[in-house]
Amino acid sequence: MVSIRPDEISSILKQQITDYDQSVSVSNVGTVLQIGDGIARIYGLDQVMAGELLEFEDGTEGIALNLEDDNVGAVLMGEALGVQEGSNVKSTGKIASVPVGEAMQGRVVNPLGQPIDGKGEIPTSDTRLIEEMAPGIIKRRSVHEPMQTGITSIDAMIPVGRGQRELIIGDRQTGKSAIAIDTIINQKGQDVVCVYVAIGQKSASVANVVEVLREKGALDYTIVVSAGASEAAALQYLAPYTGAAIAEHFMYQGKATLVIYDDLTKQAQAYRQMSLLLRRPPGREAYPGDVFYCHSRLLERAAKLSDDMGGGSMTALPIIETQAGDVSAYIPTNVISITDGQIFLSADLFNSGLRPAINVGISVSRVGGAAQTKAIKKIAGTLKLELAQFDELAAFSQFASDLDEATQQQLERGKRLRELLKQAQFSPLNLAEQVAVVYAGVKGLIDEVPVEDVTKFAAELREYLKLNKAEFIEEILKEKKLNDGLEATLKEVIKEVKSSMLATV
């Protein structure tokens, strides 16, 4: 028979009483009234913030967007197949945040910061709120450093500076994404962290972009945020803010960052879908009234910080798709008014064989001129004007039979300048190569070269400089100026390449 030991029993009871935890966890729980089309109506969530994360029974997350008298309208970030009417919903007390940090580089994540590239978890403990206030006036300084895209026509005529917002706008299939990806590739070795946000794109297209970046060695300093076409509208809406939050982390550490939003038209459409399903009143083109604020609060986060704040920068290249070149539609005009300039891509120029198909006449950079390097500013001053005049003259000359010699000469030079600015995809040029090519065209040194051989001449000129005049390239890249000595060298090189080429033609 087992002997009972009262002292042992009493000590156990005392221990239980001592360890008894009286704390009570209170959670704010509601009930799903209605669900469908990625929207849930919830009753009973009294203490909930606008934009707060909600947790459904099956683990799906949602965001509270509509706070009404008797219910809360929430958007679902997932398929939510397990959520039914009558299911419980819990408020988390948190606003959406994403992981940030060095470990994110080279990875592909979804808008919640979860890896989707099959390489395992991301080892980072730092997080940042998706929605952050943009830095104020005192925290900023004016744009003064160049963000070289590697595309001659942009760096010479529509220069982009670090901290600028430059819109890339054009019809579908005119090379908008190609310009953005070229810019990322050109940042190799520049200590710039790049974030590519793909919104509503085909998964195959995103996989293709990731593969190109990997081949070119650009994925090591790039983070890809992808919300595919098959994802919930809420995720497509959140993706740009996630990209901005990831880049902001590096910006506040004093680094230069570049963010591509490809494209904000799809984000606006996702936001319109959510808003209409939430029964918000529609405005122009059925977009909600605050779609301007949706884009402005995103793009205002791009900045060049003051030296007191570490001097970091976030350069934003938002992309907008137009319908049949209509830049006066609602979303294009909104984003044009928010940004510091736009690069307009023309379908007609693209189809005529001009790549990149930049329409120089209506493309502009409002602040990038201050950031342009002296070398290219010195020689490219007249380039934009000459090309704009060439476009007008070319249109006029179709109706005129006899043109005077000066007009004829201007047309011939315009044709050569346009040929010089043609550039293959994924092959950005460094500053020295751009200076050499633009100098040859603007100074009229290739007026004798047949138009059809101009592209070949530009390639041979760049090759000659690399092989025989490496010191010229080094000097330009280091000093970023074209002094008299370098100019004389360049003239000699152009003369030599031209004579050897004309001899073989």
Curated annotation (Swiss-Prot):
Keyword Transport: yes
EC number(s) given by UniProt: 7.1.2.2
Gene3D superfamilies according to UniProt: 2.40.30.20, ATP synthase alpha/beta chain, C-terminal domain, P-loop containing nucleotide triphosphate hydrolases
Membrane topology type: Peripheral membrane protein
Enzyme class: translocase
Location in the cell: Cellular thylakoid membrane
Pfam families linked: ATP-synt_ab, ATP-synt_ab_C, ATP-synt_ab_N
Binding residues annotated for ATP, in chain numbering: 170-177
Stretch forming the signal peptide: none
GO CC terms of this entry: plasma membrane-derived thylakoid membrane; proton-transporting ATP synthase complex
Keywords: ATP synthesis, ATP-binding, CF(1), Hydrogen ion transport, Ion transport, Membrane, Nucleotide-binding, Thylakoid, Translocase, Transport
Subunit structure: F-type ATPases have 2 components, CF(1) - the catalytic core - and CF(0) - the membrane proton channel. CF(1) has five subunits: alpha(3), beta(3), gamma(1), delta(1), epsilon(1). CF(0) has four main subunits: a(1), b(1), b'(1) and c(9-12).
Purpose of the protein: Produces ATP from ADP in the presence of a proton gradient across the membrane. The alpha chain is a regulatory subunit.
Family from the record: Belongs to the ATPase alpha/beta chains family.
Protein name: ATP synthase subunit alpha
Organism: Prochlorococcus marinus (strain MIT 9312)
Originating gene: atpA
